[in-house]
């Protein structure tokens, strides 16, 4: 399977503003498990970090679990991408 999940900034914004950071966490689970999308721990890491930015700290252990499997520079790059997604969604 070589698919990417289709989610818009408006969708993310609604999840954040309506207080549904668990939905963003579920999006990360889809990538981590390869459920309907191509499995990617890096993409899962991004969405778990977006969930953290949205206030969902139940993903802290998942971020702590995946983080050490990535290089420091990769973690920084992916974390920066997550912050960018979060801030763009709020401005959208």
Explain the meaning of each model-derived region.
Residues 2-10, 38-46, 76-77:
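Structural signature of tandem alpha-helical TPR/SEL1-like repeats
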Residues 17-21, 33-35, 40, 54-57:
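Short helix-capping/linker turns of helical repeat alpha-solenoids
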């Amino acid at each position: 399977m070589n698919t990417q999940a289709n989610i818009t900034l408006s969708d993310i914004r609604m999840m954040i503003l309506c207080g549904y950071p668990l939905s963003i966490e579920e999006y990360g689970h889809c990538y981590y498990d390869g459920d309907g999308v191509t499995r990617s721990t890096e993409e899962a890491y991004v969405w778990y970090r977006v969930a953290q930015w949205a206030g969902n700290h139940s993903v802290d252990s998942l971020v702590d679990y995946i983080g050490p499997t990535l290089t420091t520079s990769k973690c920084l790059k992916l974390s920066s991408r997550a912050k960018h997604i979060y801030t763009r969604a709020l401005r959208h």
